[in-house]
């Protein structure tokens, strides 16, 4: 099993949904960075369960503890261990379905691959695993902000059939995103989303959605062609998030329907540098950042755990009706916002450190 990500800024996560705790070990964080638990907690609070009526009823404070790697509030350059205790475990919710592979979950594939699996919750496949990446991403964001002034902001673009419009990626802030519990900054659309999700929660069903993310102030030159292009690493990071099913950058699939004369980003002189008049490339050309905002979208499927009865089969082939008792989000996208931001930060910092490492060779 692969639980590590990154080359120079390397993170290794651990823990399952109903074990004693989850966390991450960070290798490669630069020394001398001012870092407190409060710096990390802000992002964890944005992803924790039980925030509002649109999320799971599981109650977790998700209080982070820095176990190593800092002294007197500064990083030492040694491994940083970040840990969060699980406090509201209910493994008993899964006792009567332990022999039933839940539809669209990892139960079947984990059992077939490893011959054993965590019988309660999703184990390593649970979204609890993302606590580690969000914590490590919060550290990465602080480095990126200090070194380059990089800002990473994600928001909910759509929920089920409901689509937001008129959101300016160049100016949107996290404060604007967090004003709505749906994390859609389009106030009118946000109200429609919240109503739709609430109705689904009452029915015991779920829906999916799309998260858009913008990375601003990225320097030119990040990315390692050919096989570690910046968009390729971003895609890998985003598709590693539980429930993610699609990734597109810049014009994405819609760009395939344009002409070259429509799609090409023409170069112009602006802000005392060479830039582009449009951004259909999404801030990346040839697998390397070009200095324009990096804009991408991630699609998330409907939450697999629903309360409605579903006909499925046991591992021995017996047909049974399953009705899940576990707590779940009727739609994951609002809580996916800090996860998407954090995974993007992990990619950006690792690529930035790799680029910086070659600068002073001669």
Curated annotation (Swiss-Prot):
Listed cofactors: FMNH2
GO molecular function, one term: chorismate synthase activity
GO biological process: amino acid biosynthetic process; aromatic amino acid family biosynthetic process; chorismate biosynthetic process
GO cellular component: cytosol
UniProt entry keywords in alphabetical sequence: Amino-acid biosynthesis, Aromatic amino acid biosynthesis, FAD, Flavoprotein, FMN, Lyase, NADP
Residues the record lists as binding FMN: 124-126, 286, 301-305, 327
Lineage top rank: taxon: Bacteria
Catalytic reactions on record: 5-O-(1-carboxyvinyl)-3-phosphoshikimate = chorismate + phosphate
Record's signal peptide: none
Assembly and interaction partners: Homotetramer.
Function: This reaction introduces a second double bond into the aromatic ring system.
Gene3D superfamilies in UniProt: Chorismate synthase AroC
Gene: aroC
Residues reported to bind NADP(+): 47
Family: Belongs to the chorismate synthase family.
CDD domains: Chorismate_synthase
Pfam family, one: Chorismate_synt
Name under which the protein is recorded: Chorismate synthase
Cofactor binding description: Reduced FMN (FMNH(2)).
Documented EC number(s): 4.2.3.5
Keyword set includes Iron: no
Metabolic or biological pathway, per its Swiss-Prot or TrEMBL entry: Metabolic intermediate biosynthesis; chorismate biosynthesis; chorismate from D-erythrose 4-phosphate and phosphoenolpyruvate: step 7/7
